[in-house]
UniProtKB/Swiss-Prot annotation:
CDD domains: RNRR2
PROSITE patterns, sorted: RIBORED_SMALL (PS00368)
Function: Ribonucleoside-diphosphate reductase holoenzyme provides the precursors necessary for viral DNA synthesis. Allows virus growth in non-dividing cells. Catalyzes the biosynthesis of deoxyribonucleotides from the corresponding ribonucleotides.
Active site: Y108
Induction, per UniProt: Expressed in the early phase of the viral replicative cycle.
Organism: African swine fever virus (isolate Tick/Malawi/Lil 20-1/1983) (ASFV)
One protein family per Pfam: Ribonuc_red_sm
Protein name: Ribonucleoside-diphosphate reductase small chain
Length: 327
């Protein structure tokens, strides 16, 4: 039986620490805590309106994916990993990750509410699984590999790394290119926060596979999972570019195809497997961002000096007028 799944009936508290490396992962993740209201999107509204319609359509597909994907990640954490895993240090990490995923989900909802005032169009994005066949297909694939009745813990961790890494990565890339155009500063800031978090989540899954999983899946199974994820990303990219009529400034879909293969080979390395694609990075000017090497000081520099919120719906507004008696 996997060590991660063995109950220690004699352990009731986190101290003394028994798995220091896992504890260090948790503490690093804890240090990255932020809230969805910390990003100012007021300047994004004009940039969004000035953006060519095909480009807006492309980014709407990305938002539709993210709104759904984070909820599925939360579902897996709460219904599977957090119920099964017994090593407290790992459980602490996943508890913190679940909280972060809730922040991400809220952040994407704020982005949709801020940029897309039409309620019917908002609902089409919030209902991504029903309205976008490729998003439904991706969601089904994620649930398939997260199913404990069908897959070993090792296989599910590989699938989880593929979700947090491969399925998300090209979308992070596409949003980050808006920074090069000097537009959408709020969306870009959210992207930098979230991509940093997801990089940690993905890396931790790879760490567990390499250091804690006894029944590591065969290399051919790992490759199968990763290649399936790449194929889904390819399909999504084609779909999003079709919606944009093939016109998205800064990159082509062929560059995104190559990048996701480059990223997947990096995942193979982290899982101590042979590379699959052996391709170079088509975006060398953004390597530091893509590999989540942003320094912690830069992360905190992203925080605005005051909280602002441009969403007009009171249900999404952040209440800043609490006095001390409310705590």
């Amino acid at each position: 039986m996997e060590e991660l799944l063995i109950e220690n009936s004699q352990r009731f508290t986190i101290f003394p620490i028994q798995h220091p490396e896992c504890w260090n992962w948790y503490k690093k993740l804890e240090s990255m805590t932020w809230t969805a209201q910390e990003v100012d999107m007021c300047k994004d509204i004009d940039d969004w309106e000035a953006m060519p319609k095909p480009q807006r359509e492309f980014y709407k597909q990305i938002l539709a994916f993210f709104v759904v994907a984070d909820e599925i990640v939360i579902e897996n954490l709460l219904t599977n990993f957090m119920r099964e895993i017994k090593v407290k240090e790992v459980l602490y990490f996943y508890t913190m990750q679940a909280a972060q995923e809730c922040v991400h989900s809220e952040a994407y909802s704020i982005q949709v509410k801020t940029l897309i005032p039409d309620e019917k169009e908002q609902q089409r994005i919030f209902s991504g699984i029903e309205k976008h066949p490729i998003i439904k297909k991706m969601a089904q694939w994620v649930r398939q590999w997260m199913d404990p009745a069908r897959n070993s813990l090792g296989e599910r961790l590989v699938g989880f790394a593929a979700v947090e890494g491969i399925l998300f990565q090209n979308h992070f890339v596409a949003i980050q290119f808006l920074k090069e155009q000097n537009i959408m500063p709020g969306l870009v800031s959210y992207n930098e926060f979230i991509s940093r978090d997801e990089g940690m989540h993905c890396s931790f899954a790879c760490f567990l596979i390499s250091n804690y999983v006894y029944n590591i899946p065969e290399e051919k199974i790992i490759h199968k999972i990763l290649k399936e994820a790449v194929e889904l990303v390819d399909e999504f990219i084609n779909y999003a570019f079709d919606k944009a009529r093939g016109r998205v400034p800064g990159f082509s879909k062929e560059m995104l195809f190559q990048y996701i293969r480059y990223f997947t080979d990096n995942l193979c390395f982290m899982m101590q497997c042979k590379s699959i694609y052996n391709v170079g990075n088509p975006f060398p000017q953004m390597t530091k961002f893509f590999l989540n090497e942003v320094e912690k000081t830069n992360f905190f520099e992203l925080r605005p000096t005051q909280y602002q919120n441009c969403v007009k719906d009171d249900a999404f507004a952040f209440k800043l007028f609490l006095d001390d008696d409310d705590f």
